Amino acid sequence: MKKKIAIFHPWIKSRGGAEKTVLELLKNFKGSELYTWVYEKDNTFEEFKKYKINVIGNNFFRRFSHSNILRGLFLISSFSSKIPLEKYDLFLISTSGVGEFILFKNYKPGKTYAYVHTPLRDADKDIINWNLKNKHRNIISKTIYLLAVNVYK
């Protein structure tokens, strides 16, 4: 019997390796459904249009999906992002730092799995130092940035 899988990927908004991986999962696990906080169909692979994509969460936070600092606000959106897991045999989460927030309202004991496509680059010490020196020069920007990346230490 085929397993029905719910796949969560935080944002489908570009044409990268993580999006290709999600597409391969959808191709190989027929009948699976994708859940995401952000889906920008014109900015990602055309193939996504073949699959059922459920955009969940609060619309307000979607405008922050392109800001590395403010993506942490999706933590708040996690509290209202409910996936009907009773319809699925497995729940697969793609994460690199914020995807696991979806677990606040969604967990299927023994049936929830997460994979990391790439570590959260913004939590790397060298990248933090570079960002503080080159991107976040004023005190307000530095403070917000440090608060955001401190979550991952």
Where are these regions (language model features)?
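Short amphipathic alpha-helix
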Residues: 18-29
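Active-site donor-binding segments of glycosyltransferases and PAPS-dependent sulfotransferases
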Residues: 33-101
